[in-house]
Swiss-Prot record:
Subcellular location: Virion
Family matches, as InterPro entries: Phage_lambda_Stf-r2 (IPR005068), Phage_Tail_Fiber_Structural (IPR051934)
Biased composition (Polar residues): 225-235
Protein name as annotated: Major tail fiber protein S
GO biological process, one term: virion attachment to host cell
Keywords: Host-virus interaction, Viral attachment to host cell, Viral tail fiber protein, Viral tail protein, Virion, Virus entry into host cell
Family: Belongs to the tail fiber family.
Region Disordered, annotated ranges: 225-247
Length: 247
């Protein structure tokens, strides 16, 4: 008995012609496009872990994702109108910079239907993801699929990059889910305070504050008085007392 192979063919529409497009379907013609559209509009672009810029010795900028027990970076970029691509950093990367310039260090992701990148074809000169060091100007804008890692402002007279030259204030850091902590002394910016932490902070502040009366030498609580014959220096006159004196 011979094996029989059944071949079926279907005709599919252009995805651009559809008013609604759902997740990966049976007989999906372009799987890469289907997967790369899955989280567009759900996962915001930005850095979720790693991609930390540091001095790399001399005029080198090191970008690493080794941070404590974390050894890989994760970032999300929007590409075109419909796609989202996740980029992982698995190894440290060093960029050689020059003195006397201000740089924008950019992470760039790429996806184009029908285009091979070096990630899947060694004959391609197009990178699926890469770091780019560009001259920074006040009118500088990010392009499609790009995220700003940091800016680096290097004076002309230096021979080594320092941490003070690296500015990450404009980069977009993201988090899916938030860790909750009971600590009232933590300096972390990626952890939310629990109800217990709020109560601890309130109780601590309350225990440290003791109300005191105001006087001519210190600020504090003031009690009002309508008396017109008082010698007190810790009480304040009411409008009634002032009126009585005036009358």
């Amino acid at each position: 008995m011979n094996d029989v192979t059944v071949v079926t063919s279907v005709t599919y529409p252009s995805s651009e012609s559809l008013a609604l497009v759902a997740d990966v379907q049976y007989h999906e013609p372009y799987l890469s496009a289907a997967l790369n559209r899955k989280f567009r509009g759900i996962v915001d672009p930005g850095f979720y872990a790693g991609f930390l810029p540091k001095p790399g010795g001399g005029m080198n900028l090191l970008i690493t994702s080794v941070d404590g027990d974390k050894t890989a970076g994760a970032a999300s970029v929007d590409i075109g109108e419909f796609y989202q691509v996740t980029i992982q950093q698995r190894k440290d990367i060093s960029l050689a910079l020059s003195a006397g310039k201000k740089y924008a260090i950019v992470l760039k992701g790429r996806y184009l239907l029908g285009e091979d990148t070096y990630q899947v074809n060694t004959a391609s000169h197009i990178h699926a993801a890469e770091f780019v060091a560009r001259t920074y100007t006040d009118s500088y804008q990010l392009g499609d699929g790009e995220l700003l890692v940091c800016t680096v402002n290097i004076p002309a007279s230096v021979s080594a990059i320092t941490q003070e030259m690296i500015d990450t204030s404009e980069r977009i850091n993201r988090s899916i889910g938030i860790d909750i902590s009971d600590s009232v002394t933590s300096t972390r910016s990626d952890v939310a305070a629990s109800s217990l932490a709020v109560k601890k902070a309130y109780d601590l502040a309350k225990s440290k504050y003791t109300a005191q009366d105001a006087s001519t030498t210190q600020k504090g609580l003031v009690q009002l008085s309508s008396a017109t014959n008082s010698d007190s220096e810790t009480m304040a006159a009411t409008p009634k007392a002032v009126k009585s004196i005036k009358d």
